[in-house]
Each structure stands twice: as C-alpha cells, then as structure tokens.
C-alpha cells in the first residue's frame, strides 16, 4: 500500500485536474485510472468566480482525496499564504508545495522551497515538496520536515520523460525510507514504467492524460504502466550486461566428434 502521512492508498497514480475537455471526461478518467488522489490549484478555485464553487462541489462528489497545491507561486510569501488559504478551503493539512524560479522552465526555486517548507512544517502542514532531481536538495527538504518529496523527471508539461535516471536513482538509494513521487515531465506510459522501475513510490501527472487524444484510454494505459513498473521493481530487475550470456543450459548437449 502507498502511504502518505499515515494514510494508505491502493493506487500509485496521482492525477492533476487541469486542462481536461470537460468535467465529465475528468470524472471518467478518475474512474478508469483508479486514482484516489487528485491535485487542485487554489488559484483555480479562487480565480474562477462562480464556476470555482461548482468545480469544488464536483470534486467532492468524486469521493477522492484532494491534494491542494501552490502552483504559480514565485516567492516564499506567496507559497506560504496560498498554503494557508488552501488549508482553510479544503480542510486538509496536506499541501503540494511549489515555488517556481523560472517562468519559462517552471524549474523550482530550491532555496525558497526549502525555506517555505520549514515555515509550513512549523505550522503543522504535511508537505509534498515539488523539487528537482538533486539529492542534496532532497536531503535538505527531509531535514526541514518533508516526508514526501516529489522530484521532477523533466520540466512540467515537456513530456520528455526521465532525463537523469542516475540522479533519480541516487535519491532513491540514499533515501530508502522516504516516500518519493515523480512529478512533472512524464509524457507516455513507458516513461512512468521507467520511473517506477527506479524504485519510486508513485507518479503524479496531468498533461499527458488531459491533452491526449483519448484521455480516458490514456488514463487506463498509465494506470497499467505504473503498476507494471512497480511490480518489476519489487520482483527484481535483471542488471544490464556488456556481453551476451546464454539462457539455454548446455548440460546434456550432444557432443559431436
């Protein structure tokens, strides 16, 4: 079972709720994927006027766990204030903490991220920290109280898939007991499988499903891909070799003179 701050879940696929063609498509995606956790931007809820209340009511009817996020925040103050508002609105101590450093790459500002995480941890938040694939940053986030860390595998929405598998693998190796979720950059189901084969606990994605030609079918594909990668990691994956190794035994082989 997947465990986030003492709560257990069966699905290892988390989904964003933006960019879907319609709420009904989103409903079908959640049902088909089996996901139990969806992320929601507070800015969407507060900026949408009367429609924001309708969307919040729609989410409550889905019977899934809501993970609010601080998407679009560029400063510590913005992120902390947004998290506080999200806690009041969604009635949860969970927050997916994002502090963006560059508007083009959407790369996290790791310095502001660590400081904001420390502030929010002191206020009792349970933080899901969106960060890069840098081990030292992950260790610093752990030091300030983050128990779920979400390294990217590529920039948000880029669909490039895991670019630095060595970096992602080192985070898993050095932090074996920490819950790790790949967040951002996943473009195809095979990317999700690769990430899970590295030993990660879950995948969070949005664009790859929402903007596909058939979001419902793609959601099912990702669900199966995540499970396949997780099962492969647990089973023990064969190490790559530089030379051929025969798979057929030679015992009993006929000898011709």
From Swiss-Prot:
Stated family: Belongs to the ThiG family.
Keywords linked to the UniProt accession: Cytoplasm, Schiff base, Thiamine biosynthesis, Transferase
Catalytic activity, EC: 2.8.1.10
Root EC class: transferase
Any single biological process term in GO: thiamine diphosphate biosynthetic process
Subunit structure: Homotetramer. Forms heterodimers with either ThiH or ThiS.
Gene responsible for this protein: thiG
Domain of life of the organism encoding this protein: Bacteria
Function field: Catalyzes the rearrangement of 1-deoxy-D-xylulose 5-phosphate (DXP) to produce the thiazole phosphate moiety of thiamine. Sulfur is provided by the thiocarboxylate moiety of the carrier protein ThiS. In vitro, sulfur can be provided by H(2)S.
Native source species: Bartonella bacilliformis (strain ATCC 35685 / KC583 / Herrer 020/F12,63)
Pfam families with a match to the protein in the record: ThiG
Reactions mediated catalytically: [ThiS sulfur-carrier protein]-C-terminal-Gly-aminoethanethioate + 2-iminoacetate + 1-deoxy-D-xylulose 5-phosphate = [ThiS sulfur-carrier protein]-C-terminal Gly-Gly + 2-[(2R,5Z)-2-carboxy-4-methylthiazol-5(2H)-ylidene]ethyl phosphate + 2 H2O + H(+)
Keyword match Transferase: yes
Entry's Gene Ontology cellular component terms: cytoplasm
Keyword Transferase among UniProt keywords: yes
Catalytic residues of the enzyme: 96 (schiff-base intermediate with dxp)
Annotated GO MF terms: thiazole synthase activity
Pathway in which the depicted protein is active: Cofactor biosynthesis; thiamine diphosphate biosynthesis
Chain residues that bind 1-deoxy-D-xylulose 5-phosphate: 157, 184-185, 206-207
Cell compartment(s), UniProt: Cytoplasm
Official protein name in the record: Thiazole synthase
First-listed, main subcellular location of the protein, grouped into a coarse class: cytoplasm
